[in-house]
Regions:
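RNase H-like, Mg2+-dependent phosphodiesterase core
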Residues: 1-206
Length: 206
C-alpha cells in the first residue's frame, strides 16, 4: 500500500527565512468565479513553524472545520488582514485586477508590514514588496493555506448575509456561484445589485 509523504507546509516559508526574510505573509483569495458578490482576499503572517492541526487547502475542508480553523488562525497569527473588491470594481477593472486590489488592501492591514509575500497562483503584480507565487500554494504553504481559510470563511459569511437581503437567489447555499438554482432564479427575477454584470453578459445574450 502506497503512503503519501506528508507535505512540509513550512517549506516555502523556511526558504524565505533562509534568504533573510523574517516577516513572511501568505496571501490568497476566495470568490473569483461566482456570478455575484465581491472577491475577498486575506493576508496572514503566522508565527514561525506554528502547527495548526488540519491546516490544508480550504477547498478540501468541511465548512464546520474551516470555521473552527478560522478562529484558531485569527487567534494565533502575528497579524492578518482581510479585504474585498466589490462587484462594481470587478465589473470596472476585471476580476484579475480586482483580485489584486483586494490582496493589496489585505496586505496593507498587516502590522508589522510583511517583508515578503507568498501568493497563491502563478500571476502577480507590483505590490511594493518582494513576491513569490506558488501554484496550488493553498495546499503547499501554511501561510497561504491560512489566508485561503480566512478569505473563504469571511466571504461565505457575507454571502449568507446577502441571502437574507435577497432570499430568492439562494446565496447562502451556492455563495454566488453559477448553479442550476442560481441560473433559474436569474431567469425568474433578473439580477440584483450584487450581481457581476460582466459575468452575466453571455447568459443574457443567450
Amino acid at each position: 500500500m502506497k503512503h503519501e509523504t506528508p507535505i512540509d507546509l513550512w517549506l516555502y516559508e523556511k526558504e524565505a527565512f533562509a534568504d533573510g526574510f523574517q516577516l513572511v505573509c501568505g496571501v490568497d483569495e476566495a470568490g473569483r468565479g461566482p456570478l455575484a458578490g465581491p472577491v475577498c482576499a486575506a493576508a496572514v503572517i503566522l508565527p514561525p513553524e506554528l502547527v495548526i492541526p488540519g491546516l490544508n487547502d480550504s477547498k478540501k475542508l468541511t465548512d464546520k472545520k474551516r470555521r473552527e480553523l478560522c478562529s484558531v488562525i485569527t487567534a494565533e497569527a502575528v497579524s492578518y488582514g482581510i479585504a474585498f473588491a466589490s462587484e462594481q470594481e470587478i465589473d470596472e477593472i476585471n476580476i484579475l485586477q480586482a483580485t489584486f486590489l483586494a490582496m493589496e488592501r489585505a496586505m496593507a492591514q498587516l502590522a508589522p508590514p510583511p517583508e515578503l509575500a507568498l501568493i497563491d497562483g502563478n500571476r502577480s503584480k507590483d505590490f511594493g514588496l518582494p513576491v513569490r507565487t506558488i501554484v496550488k500554494g493553498d495546499s503547499l504553504s501554511a501561510s497561504i493555506a491560512a489566508a485561503s481559510i480566512l478569505a473563504k470563511v469571511t466571504r461565505d459569511r457575507l454571502m449568507e448575509q446577502y441571502d437574507e437581503q435577497y432570499p430568492q437567489y439562494g446565496f447562502a447555499v451556492h455563495k454566488g456561484y453559477g448553479t442550476k438554482r442560481h441560473y433559474a432564479a436569474l431567469r425568474e427575477y433578473g439580477p440584483c445589485p450584487i450581481h457581476r454584470m460582466t459575468f452575466l453578459k453571455k447568459f443574457y445574450e443567450n
